Amino acid sequence: MPKEKNDVCLTLENVSKVFARVESDEVTHALQDVSVTMKSGEFVSLVGPSGCGKSTILRLVAGLIPPTLGRAAVNGEEIDGPSPERGLVFQNPTLFPWLTVEKNISFSLDVRGAKAGKAERVECMLSMIGLERFRNDYPAQLSGGMAQRVALVRTLINEQEILLLDEPLGALDEFTRMNMQDEILNIWAQRKQLALMVTHSIDEAVYMGTRVLVMESNPGRIVADIKIDEDFPRDRSSASFVEYRNEILNRLHFGGKKD
């Protein structure tokens, strides 16, 4: 069974990130003066054009890169590197092709030598994504949606406090993508951790997020923090859903464009 979670407070305080260009003396201002606070139980969607710093924020929170200026902290403690309490799921499943579904899911536990309750935790993850009868299959035998579910629970088995999702559904077809949106929301609702997701889809951001952070580029910055005050599951055709969608479009200077 999942362990009881402590409340988490993630803060970015006046964070800027600058990348030097190898081929010239110029620099890229990926983020400039970003300040935001997120807490347990929130599902925060990051949306904006390519190059606005969405994935940079995830990498900062994951501890893969440090800020150039400012501070990133969890419960007041500065992030100074990766932690099993902050799990990152990428767009592509990146499963180990030589391991079965079951072995892929248990991989991080095996590496850490975490034997206590291992079998129960793996069984819980398989049940959560409905793949019990595929436990002995290999990644090449799975559909795209099945592989992404395995990648998701391979991260979740560490029972982290913060779940980071970097366009986790971008490579899937539309039908599988919608099913996976519900899968992720169901898991998030059970675990009650903080989830932070990067997406290029405004509909996905509104459908899944309790908050949507809208970003612009040059330099990367947050220009709007929109609370989505709707119960789950959400109706994509409802007037309120369309209103939220149009508000985000307006923030991104696409007001007046309607599908």
Model-inferred region functions:
Residues 47-49:
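The feature captures the beta-strand-to-loop junction immediately N-terminal to the Walker
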Residues 102-110, 119, 227:
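Short helical segment in ABC ATPase nucleotide-binding domains corresponding to the A-loop/adjacent helical element
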Residues 138-142, 146:
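Conserved ABC ATPase signature
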Residues 157-161:
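A short, proline-enriched helix->beta-strand linker immediately N-terminal to the Walker B motif
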Residues 70-82:
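Conserved ABC transporter NBD signature motif
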Residues 113-134, 186:
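Conserved ABC ATPase "signature" region
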